Amino acid sequence: MKVAFIINDFDSMNLEKDTSVFLMNEAFKRGYDVFSFGVNDVTYKLNNIFAKCEKVNFPDPSLLSFTKENTDLQHLDQFDYVINRVTPPFNKEYLYLTQLLDLADIKCINPAQALREENEKLVILNFPEIIPVTKVTNSLDEIKNMFKEGCKKIVIKPLDGMGGKSIFSLSEFDKNINVIWETITQNGRKHVMLQE
């Protein structure tokens, strides 16, 4: 089987934290031919979508080290699966890519339309019975209300972040709650997620 991963640049990945590397490694261990390409590697022509891919090999699958070899332009319908792993922030190039993927007759594990329409942080709100107490707000009062409502600790995180960046754990008596709120919400201009 052949699987292609749409990723951010390998050189910018944190190999210890980036799930894409673990997914590629696991696919390789299972005998898949693993390829990767980026948002800017895509070409649409003659009603087909192509990408300048790199073949990814893991010489020792027990390690996260890998090798890459360039390939010719690959027709995306030749892959058994395509997995979009591009991380935020998303820009117009990413939006265009998802629209091109919609036009292609390919097996995309995470459909482009769903990626455009669903925020990965907000999608959990569809499952209130299995998530901790959660609020989405830009209000400092709501942060303080969570403590009044009985939460001992809360986690505050941006809706568009990834990789653990700008995530804070707060307790009721932290002296820097106001500063964290100002920073993460840009003084109330951005919504954030609060979780017990």
Question: Regions from the language model: what does each represent?
Answer:
Residues 43, 143-144:
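Generic structural signal for individual residues within well-ordered alpha-helical segments
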Residues 12, 16-136:
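Conserved N-proximal alpha/beta basic substrate-recognition cap immediately N-terminal to
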Residues 1-4:
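Extreme N-terminal starter segment of soluble prokaryotic enzymes
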Residues 7-11:
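Extended, domain-scale alpha-helical bundle/helix-rich regions
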Residues 140-141, 147-153, 160-196:
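Phosphate-binding site of ATP-dependent enzymes
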Residues 6, 83-86, 158:
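Short, well-ordered coil/turn residues at beta-beta hairpins
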Residues 60, 158-160:
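Short acidic, glycine-rich loop/turn motifs
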